[in-house]
Curated annotation (Swiss-Prot):
GO terms for molecular function: ATP binding; CTP synthase activity; glutaminase activity; identical protein binding; metal ion binding. The gene is pyrG. This is CTP synthase. Allosterically activated by GTP, when glutamine is the substrate; GTP has no effect on the reaction when ammonia is the substrate. The allosteric effector GTP functions by stabilizing the protein conformation that binds the tetrahedral intermediate(s) formed during glutamine hydrolysis. Inhibited by the product CTP, via allosteric rather than competitive inhibition. Pathway: Pyrimidine metabolism; CTP biosynthesis via de novo pathway; CTP from UDP: step 2/2. The lineage of its organism: Bacteria, Bacillati, Chloroflexota, Dehalococcoidia, Dehalococcoidales. GO terms for cellular component: cytosol. InterPro entries: Class_I_gatase-like, CTP_synthase, CTP_synthase_N, GATASE, GATase1_CTP_Synthase, P-loop_NTPase. It holds the Pfam family GATase. It comes from Dehalococcoides mccartyi (strain CBDB1). ATP binds at residues 14-19, 71. One of its GO terms (biological process) is 'de novo' CTP biosynthetic process. Mg(2+) binds at residues 71, 141. Residues 1-267 are annotated as: Amidoligase domain.
Length: 544
């Protein structure tokens, strides 16, 4: 039978619940326990797939094609597991299912209420993940902040779980912020006290309180929170801001969190072994040369829109013995001012996924700059598509080349709608989503990167390379090095004669891990670190 850890947040949103949950999973896995994770999002959207990146940030895709919150990406990276659609629950999903059941007559004419019907549906989804994953521990993050109207049914559901499954099988953790008052130069505990009081009013007494702060926390604060929040002193955990998020599991373990979880839930666990993770953090903190990469996108004002891309670049830089500097370049700025101003100092250019015509010409200009100047380039999803468009326009001379996403009547549609997408009007959950196999051509850059002829990668797209132009582009120097097993879909393309110019229709950023960077990112950074740009001087050997 699975044990459950429920994690709530207080005082403010974005306090670090997601990284805390991911770190708890990391700690438990280091003790030989199997872990699964679930995110409960109280918003009424069915999933974030149709939400603006400016409102939600990145949409993370699971192996089975669920469009989910970016926190699931953190869970996968920290715990090194692959999650499924069972790991994401929204109010939209819950209420839709309850209403559908009522329409079918499943409730036998009863009056449908938040309690018990909505809460029962939430609990059923939590239990379903436990049953299917068979994990020793299921960690459940409740999105939002205690006190939010939307979150009340979820808090009531997790309150009931302790009675349903037994007191020894459920643990509550509350993550809260200790704000710092500059004028008095002190951290304040009162917001935490009020947040815990709100939880207790609902019927949940936290077993552990994780206190986030940007400043050192005194032992007197630990005593105060323990007294006023009715939590054991050793269960008041200090989590200061650290230089890298990958240090959080080590900090929590040093505070005794792992031992608390094992003892409170009566887990049959091995001694903790975070030696590999500790080595990773030490490597991150080592002073190393910097590689400078331009990320050209259309949502760069909100960096969380490219969260997995940013982390994947970091993973690859660590592997290559480099720090990473990312220049966040808005594609529309390139349209206005040209690429030289923004790209002349960078050692590599990456263009991630996106939707819509805004900024497309700026992206195409960035691709052209990379190709003509021998700058390593990696295009992801849309980034591959604009790479194809640029090649068709400026190598083949077909200046009308475009994607039918942006120009439906293009006379040279090198990118077109997938055949199965024709006639699909609904936007939610209807793209080509999840893991699909890809056959790699040996002897190519992709073949050298993967070292394997068959791979599986995650997708999220409606448009694809138009095979009517495959022969034409191949003869001009574009190599299609990755195809679907039936050979019908182009998954990877390369430009021959270039140091590193590659595009993938899939999203490799979803499979990168801190200790195991994705092959495409790894080789991209490996190529970029060799580039010397304006104003840079290579290191000279010291005289004997």
């Amino acid at each position: 039978m699975s044990k459950f850890i429920f994690v709530t947040g207080g005082v403010v949103s974005s306090v670090g619940k997601g990284i805390t949950v991911a770190s708890l999973g990391n700690i438990l896995k280091s003790r030989g326990l199997s872990v699964s994770v679930q995110k409960l999002d109280p918003y009424l959207n069915v999933d974030p797939g149709t939400m603006s990146p400016y409102q939600h940030g990145e949409v993370f895709v699971t192996q089975d094609g669920a469009e989910t919150d970016l926190d699931l990406g953190s869970y996968e990276r920290f715990i090194d597991i692959e999650l499924t659609a069972d790991s994401t629950v929204t109010s939209g999903q819950v209420y839709s299912e309850v209403i559908n059941k009522e329409r079918r007559g499943d409730y036998l004419g009863g009056t449908i209420q938040v309690v018990p019907h909505v809460t029962q549906e939430i609990k059923a989804r939590i239990q379903r993940l436990a049953d299917r994953s068979k994990a020793d521990v299921v960690i459940v993050e409740v999105g939002g902040t205690v006190g939010d109207i939307e979150g009340q049914p979820f808090l009531e559901a997790i309150r009931q779980m302790r009675n349903d499954t037994g007191r020894d099988n459920v643990l509550y953790i509350h993550v809260t912020l200790l704000p710092y008052i500059q004028s008095t130069q002190e951290l304040k505990t009162k917001p935490t006290q009020h947040s815990v009081n709100e939880l207790r009013r609902i019927g949940i007494q936290p077993d552990i309180i994780v206190c986030r702060a940007d400043y050192p926390i005194s032992e007197g604060i630990r005593d105060k929170i323990s007294l006023f929040c009715d939590v054991e002193r050793k269960a008041v955990i200090f989590m200061p801001t650290v230089s890298t998020i990958y240090e959080v599991p080590l900090k929590l373990e040093s505070e005794g969190v792992g031992d608390l979880l094992v003892s409170r839930l009566h887990l049959n666990a091995s001694p903790s072994d975070l030696s590999v993770w500790r080595g990773l953090v030490e490597k991150i903190k080592e002073p190393t040369p910097t590689v400078r990469i331009a990320l050209v996108g259309k949502y760069v004002e909100l960096k969380d829109a490219y969260y997995s891309v940013r982390e994947s670049l970091c993973h690859a830089a660590i592997h290559n013995g480099r720090d990473i500097q990312i220049d966040w370049v808005h594609a529309e700025d390139i349209e206005k001012n040209g690429p030289e101003e923004y790209l002349k100092h960078v050692q590599g250019i990456i263009i991630p996924g996106g939707f819509g015509i805004r900024g497309i010409e700026g992206m195409i200009s960035a691709v052209k700059y990379a190709r003509e100047n021998g700058i390593p380039y990696l295009g992801l999803c849309l980034g591959m598509q604009v790479m194809v468009i640029e090649f068709a326009r400026y190598v083949l001379g077909s200046d009308k080349a475009h994607s039918t996403e942006f120009e439906p009547d293009s006379p040279y549609p090198v990118i077109d709608l997938l055949p199965e997408q024709r006639g699909v009007d609904s936007k939610g959950g209807t793209m080509r989503l999840g893991n699909y196999p890809c056959v790699i051509q040996p002897g190519t850059m992709a073949g050298q990167a993967y070292g394997n002829n068959l791979i599986n990668e995650r997708h999220r797209h409606r448009f694809e390379f138009n095979n009517d132009y495959r022969d034409t582009l191949s003869k001009a120097g574009m190599l299609f090095s990755g195809l679907s097993p039936d050979g019908k879909l182009v998954e990877i393309c390369e430009v021959t004669g270039h140091p590193f110019m590659m595009g993938s229709q899939f999203h490799p950023e979803f499979l990168s891990r801190p200790n195991r960077p994705h092959p495409l990112f790894r080789e991209f950074i490996n190529a970029a670190k060799k580039v010397i740009r304006d104003g840079e001087q290579p290191s000279l050997p010291l005289s004997p």
